[in-house]
Amino acid sequence: LLIAGCGVNSHDVSTPPPDSPIEHVDTAVVEEVVDGDTIRLRIDGSTETVRLIAIDTPETKHPTKRVECFGPEASSFLETLLVTDTTVRVERDVEPRDAYGRLLLYVFLRTDAGEMLVNREVVLRGFARPLMIEPNTRYQQQIVAAAFDAQRHARGLWKHCK
């Protein structure tokens, strides 16, 4: 993936762009990291399988595909961020679920430095590529800029995978 014409955006990702009002904001508790872009969260007392919006990590658990380059590393990285029983803030975008019934969310983690958009961080560190599917594009600019930065600095899959 070649991303041209993008610079790293210093926009605070904890605040959504002014032209995209948030309709649903919740907190959730991490139950499990399934793979690099899929997790299970406890939301309002029930467990939901969640697909992180706007990112795609290499496969590790697909029933018809082999394990892909940097897939296990992506899963491990997400496990270090989203430790079981950690409370996170989540945001829905326009389309709430994917074709597999998974809840589509942006996940935010509180850190000493402030609030981190996990979806963006996975891309920035080189564990995922951006995957923009309309109409869920609220943080598109930040995630694409993160991918450009990861590619430019040859982080993660940009260095180790063809």
Regions inferred by a protein language model and the residue ranges of each:
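Hydrophobic core
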Residues: 1-3
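Small beta-barrel nucleic-acid-binding modules, primarily SNase/OB-fold domains
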Residues: 5-162
